[in-house]
Design a protein with these regions (language model features):
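N-terminal helix-turn-helix DNA-binding core of bacterial DNA-binding proteins
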Residues: 2, 10-51, 73-84, 88
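Beta-hairpin "wing" of winged helix-turn-helix
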Residues: 61-77
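Short, hydrophobic-biased segments on the C-terminal half of alpha helices
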Residues: 56-57
């Protein structure tokens, strides 16, 4: 995907952008259970179908979901591998911060002993 400045964004950026909206997070949770049609996905939301379709477009462009049209029904399914990219990024950040906090804890302990 390309950002507003015309630069290509990293895939993990697209995933986090897609997940930044609560409606899209609910859709991802729903698709985690099983594939669903547009009408099934849109049913719980109080919004016009074109607005809801924009959410599905963002999810599909991020690679989190894929759609398939059979006859008049478009069905969406989750692409779990894209979530793993976000999980991996978060795990790296967690490790980095845990290491920093451990170092800080050691520093505080050293100061307390002095």
């Amino acid at each position: 995907m390309v950002n507003a400045a015309g630069r290509r964004t990293a895939p993990v950026d697209d995933v986090f952008r897609a997940l930044s909206d609560p409606t899209r997070r609910v859709v991802v949770e729903r698709l985690g259970r099983r594939p669903a049609s547009v009408s099934e996905l849109a049913e719980p939301f109080d919004m016009a179908l074109p607005s809801f379709m924009q959410h599905l477009r963002v999810l599909e462009e991020s690679g989190l979901v894929r759609s398939k049209k059979e006859g008049r029904v478009r069905t969406y399914r989750l692409v779990p591998g894209r979530l793993r990219a976000a999980e991996d990024w978060l795990a790296k950040q967690r490790t980095l911060w845990e290491r920093r906090l451990d170092q800080f804890d050691e520093y505080v302990t050293k100061l307390e002993r002095e």
